């Protein structure tokens, strides 16, 4: 946890430096840069919209993750690898990592870097920092870049960083809990050794080539 505090602290400092030198806020875009500013001039209204978009993005991403892990082999393998890499985490540590990563990474990537590099390049860089030791982790990198693109578009649309931060926290919190609690290997093993259901009382069984009622026990 100590290393994470240092890394996130450095990211926050870098974000504040980048935005401070340009006289900008790391939490919102200038009105003329937000795509919806013409239709929704009030920042409070755009912030509320940003929050709604963030909650929706977070919920959809969490649901998609669970569906992919339970229905595709590549996602299941990735889940197993990430689970081994992360190890056991308490609820408090999950909450800590979800909040600190969600706030810090969004302030740095969307709040500070995106106005300089643009939505697409920032999303690619966001994906590039989510890499693993082997090719199994490639979908994780691509997924992170895709989510970064959605977060970036949300920020550019509303001009408020609240939605991307909330979405990031929701995704990390829910998916870390899922990562720790769900073990596909154990589930698959239990399914293979589950005995067949016993013959129902009154069902017919074949004996000596003819069907006879099963004897109740």
Give the predicted meaning of each segment.
Residues 8, 35, 74, 120, ...:
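A residue-identity detector for tryptophan
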Residues 6, 57-61, 147:
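A structural signal for well-ordered alpha-helical scaffolds and beta->alpha junctions
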Residues 1-2, 47-49, 113:
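Membrane-water interface of alpha-helical transmembrane segments
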Residues 80-217:
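Transmembrane helix-loop-helix hairpins at the membrane interface
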Residues 10, 21-24, 39, 128, ...:
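Intrinsically disordered, low-complexity regions
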Residues 17-101, 185, 189:
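Juxtamembrane helix-loop-helix connectors linking adjacent transmembrane helices
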Residues 1-21:
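Cytosolic-side membrane-entry/anchor segment at the start of a transmembrane helix
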């Amino acid at each position: 946890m100590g290393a994470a505090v240092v890394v996130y602290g450095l990211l926050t400092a870098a974000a504040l430096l980048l935005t401070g030198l340009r006289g900008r806020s790391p939490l919102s875009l200038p009105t003329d840069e937000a795509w919806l500013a013409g239709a929704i001039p009030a920042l409070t209204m755009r912030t509320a919209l940003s929050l709604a978009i963030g909650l929706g993005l977070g919920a959809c991403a969490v649901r998609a993750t669970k569906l992919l892990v339970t229905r595709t082999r590549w996602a299941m393998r990735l889940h197993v690898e990430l689970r081994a890499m992360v190890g056991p985490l308490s609820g408090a540590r999950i909450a800590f990592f979800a909040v600190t990563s969600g706030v810090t990474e969004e302030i740095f990537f969307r709040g500070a870097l995106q106005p300089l590099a643009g939505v697409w390049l920032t999303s690619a860089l966001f994906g590039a920092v989510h890499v693993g030791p082997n090719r199994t982790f490639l979908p994780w990198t691509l997924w992170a870049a895709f989510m970064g693109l959605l977060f970036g578009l949300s920020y550019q649309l509303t001009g408020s960083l609240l939605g991307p931060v909330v979405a990031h926290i929701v995704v990390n919190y829910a998916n870390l809990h899922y990562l720790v609690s769900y073990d596909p290997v154990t589930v698959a093993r239990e399914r293979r050794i589950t005995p067949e259901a016993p013959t129902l009382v009154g069902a017919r069984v074949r004996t000596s080539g003819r069907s006879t009622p099963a004897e109740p026990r």
